[in-house]
Swiss-Prot record:
Binds 1 zinc ion. Its cofactor is Zn(2+). InterPro entries: ATP-cone_dom (IPR005144), NrdR-like_N (IPR055173), RNR_NrdR-like (IPR003796). It holds the Pfam family Zn_ribbon_NrdR. This is Transcriptional repressor NrdR. GO terms for molecular function: ATP binding; DNA binding; zinc ion binding. It comes from Halalkalibacterium halodurans (strain ATCC BAA-125 / DSM 18197 / FERM 7344 / JCM 9153 / C-125) (Bacillus halodurans). The keyword Nucleotide-binding applies. Belongs to the NrdR family.
Length: 153
């Protein structure tokens, strides 16, 4: 590792510890030449996950985009942000665990809705109405019936 102060190539690691929820390692280093101390982070380089949208276009997976949709669906609902972040993390973990490079947006939406249904029924219906693009009231009513049947079990 090259020292940022004197550009000498020799450094030694003084301390290492997990960072960012275990997804990276924080290392405290010291230059062997000038004794300058600095911090580095080491993380796994993940292969980008590509989302295939309904129209066939492709874009890189964005956990922020899912979180924004969940926040919108949960507006004025008693759902903590940590719960929504947990849903996003679970969905991303499941998708990356499949080992595929591409995933359909439909699969992402279904995974999100599956988890959101266990958190808040109103938020679930809001999310579903946007995600499934309800065309008329009958589709909306059918979704509500399915939700009520699921809750009765």
């Amino acid at each position: 590792m090259r020292c940022p102060a004197c550009h000498h190539n020799g450094t030694r690691v003084l301390d290492s510890r997990p960072a960012h929820e275990g997804r990276s390692i924080r290392r405290r280093r010291e230059c062997e030449s000038c004794n300058h101390r600095f911090t580095t982070f080491e993380m796994i380089e993940e292969v980008p996950l590509i989302v295939v949208k309904k129209d066939g276009t492709r874009q890189e997976f964005s956990s922020d985009k899912i979180l924004r949709g969940l926040i919108r669906a949960c507006e004025k609902r008693p759902v903590p942000l940590e719960t929504l972040e947990g849903i996003v993390n679970e969905v991303e973990r499941e998708l990356r665990g499949q080992g595929k490079n591409e995933v359909d947006s439909k699969e992402i939406g279904e995974l999100v809705m599956e988890r959101l249904a266990n958190v808040d029924d109103v938020a679930y219906v809001r999310f579903a109405s946007v995600y499934r693009q309800f065309k008329d009231i009958n589709v909306f009513i059918q979704e509500l019936k399915e939700l009520m049947e699921r809750d009765d079990r």
